[in-house]
Amino acid sequence: MTNLRKTHPLMKIINDAFIDLPAPSNISAWWNFGSLLGVCLVIQILTGLFLAMHYTSDTLTAFSSVAHICRDVNYGWLIRNLHANGASMFFMCLFLHVGRGIYYGSYLFKETWNIGVILLLTVMATAFVGYVLPWGQMSFWGATVITNLLSAIPYIGTTLVEWIWGGFSVDKATLTRFFAFHFILPFIVTAMVIVHLLFLHETGSNNPSGLNPDADKIPFHPYYTIKDALGLLLMILMLLLLAMFSPDPLGDPDNFSPANPLNTPPHIKPEWYSLFAYAILRSIPNKLGGVLALLASILVLLVIPLLHTANQRSMMFRPISQTLFWLLVADLIMLTWIGGQPVEQPFIIIGQVASILYFLIIIALMPLAGLLENYMLKWES
């Protein structure tokens, strides 16, 4: 009798995706982040669901309802801390996952990569609308500043902003619709994740060497299920340590004060995971130019596959490209730091140089390094 998991229509899909999936025998811990992201998404949806049971999306009671969750709901403090810090873990895993894709040339699976970039944008949008919900000072002013950027769009900008706000300022209508968006977007993300996996399983996984792994494949279970379980254990340990012992450092102190439209905080800034894009936005003194640069900072990932010039897929054996990659990582850390600083010298010029370098490395230096490495390895053909 054939095993049920190989014949049952539903079990067969799960079997082909997570059990009998042929996987390269040499993929390293950098390939763990896909499963970690899946778990992060499940944690966020579950904790979010329990928070939504007690949260009220009204300007008068939103802040109080979050305080009520932390004080009066059984383990409400833990659910809230897991949700807030879970978002940070989600983005840490996301950035490492994208970085892995760039380093090992996974972006040459174009469909998988493109849906991944759209996923990144959608998750950032979800995090933004979620950050508005506690209705603290930084929630309110963050929402005001970021939505106001759309007014830079010629002709329709102002109308568009007021349409998103549901009035002439960020108010009750804005909070209600942002709560609706924040509830629905994770399910859209889940659907996109399934498409992402669908495209990945069409080609199979890449591997550190960048060579065709078809000659040497092993079943996903038990080899990579146990490997993923170790990564999962470490991530959940980190998340629990954050949520239970140190839940606040990744947030903003201003968000402990209720939203006040009459009092602007001295430094308006988003959460840490958006700071690099915010720094690029601020480095351009023109409003529309800044908005376009902000979009380009993420969308530039879409052109990476088109700019691949090297005859080797992975950077594993390409030291010049490796150097540029780590320069890009350092540059992104620099941009993240600058995004949290006030708009004054020397931070302005540092941000502008770092922004130019970010685009220069991706669009010009990496493709040139690929050509140079081809020449040095006598791979012109």
Curated annotation (Swiss-Prot):
Coiled-coil zones: none
Subcellular location as annotated: Mitochondrion inner membrane
Binding-site residues for heme b b566, renumbered to this chain: 97, 196
Membrane topology (UniProt): Multi-pass membrane protein
Note: Heme 1 (or BL or b562) is low-potential and absorbs at about 562 nm, and heme 2 (or BH or b566) is high-potential and absorbs at about 566 nm.
Family named by the database record: Belongs to the cytochrome b family.
Any one of the GO BP annotations: mitochondrial electron transport, ubiquinol to cytochrome c
Record InterPro entries: Cyt_b/b6_C (IPR005798), Cyt_b/b6_C_sf (IPR036150), Cyt_b/b6_N (IPR005797), Cytb/b6-like_sf (IPR027387), Cytochrome_b (IPR030689), Cytochrome_b_C_euk/bac (IPR048260), Cytochrome_b_N_euk/bac (IPR048259), Di-haem_cyt_TM (IPR016174)
TM ranges: 33-53, 77-98, 113-133, 178-198, 226-246, 288-308, 320-340, 347-367
Subunit-structure text: The cytochrome bc1 complex contains 11 subunits: 3 respiratory subunits (MT-CYB, CYC1 and UQCRFS1), 2 core proteins (UQCRC1 and UQCRC2) and 6 low-molecular weight proteins (UQCRH/QCR6, UQCRB/QCR7, UQCRQ/QCR8, UQCR10/QCR9, UQCR11/QCR10 and a cleavage product of UQCRFS1). This cytochrome bc1 complex then forms a dimer.
One GO molecular-function entry: metal ion binding
Residues the entry annotates as binding heme b b562: 83, 182
Natural source organism: Perameles nasuta
Function field: Component of the ubiquinol-cytochrome c reductase complex (complex III or cytochrome b-c1 complex) that is part of the mitochondrial respiratory chain. The b-c1 complex mediates electron transfer from ubiquinol to cytochrome c. Contributes to the generation of a proton gradient across the mitochondrial membrane that is then used for ATP synthesis.
Record gene name: MT-CYB
Taxonomic lineage: Eukaryota, Metazoa, Chordata, Craniata, Vertebrata
Cofactor remark: Binds 2 heme b groups non-covalently.
Gene Ontology annotations for the cellular component aspect, listed alphabetically: mitochondrial inner membrane; respiratory chain complex III
Primary subcellular site in the record, as a coarse category: mitochondrion
PROSITE patterns assigned to the protein according to its UniProt record, in alphabetical order: CYTB_CTER, CYTB_NTER
Record SUPFAM superfamilies: a domain/subunit of cytochrome bc1 complex (Ubiquinol-cytochrome c reductase), Transmembrane di-heme cytochromes
Sites where the protein binds a ubiquinone: 201
Name this polypeptide is given: Cytochrome b
Cofactor entry: heme b
Annotated keywords: Electron transport, Heme, Iron, Membrane, Metal-binding, Mitochondrion, Mitochondrion inner membrane, Respiratory chain, Transmembrane, Transmembrane helix, Transport, Ubiquinone
